[in-house]
Curated annotation (Swiss-Prot):
It is found in: Cell membrane. It comes from the Bacteria. Its main location: membrane. F-type ATPases have 2 components, F(1) - the catalytic core - and F(0) - the membrane proton channel. F(1) has five subunits: alpha(3), beta(3), gamma(1), delta(1), epsilon(1). F(0) has three main subunits: a(1), b(2) and c(10-14). The alpha and beta chains form an alternating ring which encloses part of the gamma chain. F(1) is attached to F(0) by a central stalk formed by the gamma and epsilon chains, while a peripheral stalk is formed by the delta and b chains. This is ATP synthase subunit b. The keyword Transport applies. It is a single-pass membrane protein. The keyword Membrane applies. Belongs to the ATPase B chain family. GO terms for molecular function: proton-transporting ATP synthase activity, rotational mechanism; proton-transporting ATPase activity, rotational mechanism. InterPro entries: ATP_synth_B-like_membr_sf, ATP_synth_b/b'su_bac/chlpt, ATP_synth_F0_bsu_bac, ATP_synthase_B_chain. F(1)F(0) ATP synthase produces ATP from ADP in the presence of a proton or sodium gradient. F-type ATPases consist of two structural domains, F(1) containing the extramembraneous catalytic core and F(0) containing the membrane proton channel, linked together by a central stalk and a peripheral stalk. During catalysis, ATP synthesis in the catalytic domain of F(1) is coupled via a rotary mechanism of the central stalk subunits to proton translocation. Component of the F(0) channel, it forms part of the peripheral stalk, linking F(1) to F(0).
Length: 170
């Protein structure tokens, strides 16, 4: 079997322990001077770099949110402007429609009045022409009656004959 001093290697002495602790302390000091400080410097630089990247990312996110808000505002303004333009176009179209209807009504009234005036004028002309024809016919009949002494039947035939001639002249 193994004996305890062979397992441990040798007997434990304070001198060896003190030397081991002293060597370990020197090793720690050397590691701290040559390895720990540069390692901590690199870690600090890395921390600062990551911090600046996080700050830049947050700033970019804030700018993106601001840009998004601006774009939403511009889009909303464009919607409002387009809605206003549509409403204005509708109102303008309605005004133009009303103006066209008014103009058409005025024109139809004018044409109607002109037609009435033309009809009245034509009626007056027809009445005037008829009066002239009746007057000349009356004079003609009277002259024939004076020329002849006609009885009632001949007078009636004479009048009928002149009326038929008048109808044929038209």
């Amino acid at each position: 079997m193994l004996q305890p001093h062979l397992v441990i290697g040798s007997a434990f002495t304070f001198g060896d322990a003190f030397f081991t602790l002293f060597a370990f302390a020197i090793l720690l000091v050397l590691i701290r001077i040559y390895a720990w400080k540069p390692l901590m410097g690199v870690m600090k630089e890395r921390e600062e770099h990551i911090g600046s990247e996080i700050d830049a990312a947050e700033e970019s996110r804030a700018q993106a949110e601001q840009l998004l808000a601006e774009q939403k505002s511009v889009l909303q303004q464009a919607r409002v402007e387009s809605q206003t333009m549509i409403e204005n176009a509708k109102q303008l179209g309605e005004k133009e429609r009303e103006e066209i209807v008014k103009t058409a009504r005025r024109e139809s009234e004018r044409i109607k009045e002109e037609a009435k005036a033309d009809i009245a004028r034509e009626k007056e002309d027809a009445i005037s022409a008829l009066r002239e024809q009746v007057g000349s016919l009356s004079v003609l009949i009277a002259s024939k009656v004076i020329e002849k002494n006609l009885d009632e039947k001949e007078q009636s035939n004479l009048i009928q004959d002149y009326i038929e001639r008048l109808g044929d002249d038209k």
